[in-house]
C-alpha cells in the first residue's frame, strides 16, 4: 500500500488515525507493506499513532527546494519523508545501484538483529551497492500540487511487491502510483474524492496501459 498526500491543507488538519489504521490492518496482507508520504508535523503524529507496526523512515531528496518565501527565516525544504509500516517482514527486493568494484577487506560488524560482532569481508566484484534510506528523485509538477515522481513510486513498488501483486493508493491524486503499477506489472486500486483529479488519474493510467500494450506488441513483433 502506498499513500500519497491528497492535499497540502488536508494533511495539515488532525487526522482520525484510529479508524484509518483499523481499515489498513483489515485489508493489508500479513506480509504487506504500508508506505506513507508525510511532512511534518503530520509525519511525527503518524508514527506515534502506530508504534507497533512502525519500522523505519525513508527520505525522498528532491532536486529542487521549496519554501522560497521563508528562505530568509529558515532553511528551504528539499526532502519529504516516507514512513514504512508492516505487521511481518514484507517482500523486500533491494534496488541496488551500480558503482565501481571495491574490496575494503575484513571488518568487524555488529549484527542489527542480535547485536553480536561478526567479522565480515566487505567486497563487491561488480560494484553493486545496497540502497540507503536516502532516495534521490527529481520532482514532477504537471498534474497535482503534491505529485510524486513515477520513478520514485516505481522504486517503492519494485522493492516491496512482486509482479502481479495488488497495490492500493487511498489518496491517489493524479494517479502516479497507478501509472507506476502499470509500468511494473502490478495491479492497482486507487481512491480519489476530487472528480477533477480522478479524471486526470484515469486518463494517465489508461495512457500508460496503451503505452505498455504498444511496447509489448512491438517487442513481440520484433522477435
Map each language-model feature to its residues:
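Core catalytic lobe of class I
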Residues: 1-200, 223
Amino acid at each position: 500500500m502506498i499513500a500519497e498526500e491528497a492535499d497540502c491543507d488536508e494533511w495539515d488538519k488532525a487526522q482520525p488515525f484510529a479508524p484509518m489504521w483499523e481499515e489498513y490492518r483489515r485489508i493489508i496482507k500479513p506480509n504487506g507493506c504500508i508506505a506513507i508520504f508525510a511532512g511534518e508535523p503530520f509525519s511525527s503524529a503518524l508514527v506515534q499513532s502506530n508504534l507497533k507496526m512502525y519500522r523505519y523512515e525513508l527520505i525522498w531528496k528532491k532536486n529542487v527546494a521549496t519554501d522560497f518565501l521563508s528562505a530568509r527565516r529558515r532553511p528551504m525544504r528539499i526532502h519529504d519523508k516516507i514512513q514504512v509500516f508492516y505487521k511481518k517482514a514484507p517482500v523486500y527486493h533491494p534496488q541496488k545501484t551500480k558503482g565501481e568494484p571495491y574490496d575494503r577487506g575484513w571488518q568487524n560488524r555488529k549484527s542489527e538483529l542480535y547485536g553480536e560482532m561478526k567479522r565480515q569481508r566487505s567486497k563487491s566484484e561488480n560494484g553493486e551497492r545496497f540502497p540507503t534510506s536516502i532516495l534521490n528523485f527529481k520532482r514532477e509538477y504537471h498534474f497535482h500540487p503534491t505529485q510524486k515522481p513515477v520513478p520514485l513510486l516505481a522504486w517503492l513498488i519494485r522493492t516491496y511487491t512482486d509482479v502481479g501483486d495488488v497495490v492500493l493508493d487511498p489518496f491517489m491524486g493524479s494517479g502516479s502510483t497507478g501509472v507506476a503499477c502499470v509500468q511494473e506489472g502490478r495491479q492497482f486500486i486507487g481512491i480519489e474524492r476530487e472528480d477533477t483529479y480522478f479524471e486526470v488519474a484515469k486518463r494517465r493510467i489508461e495512457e500508460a496501459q496503451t503505452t505498455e500494450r504498444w511496447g509489448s506488441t512491438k517487442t513481440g513483433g520484433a522477435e
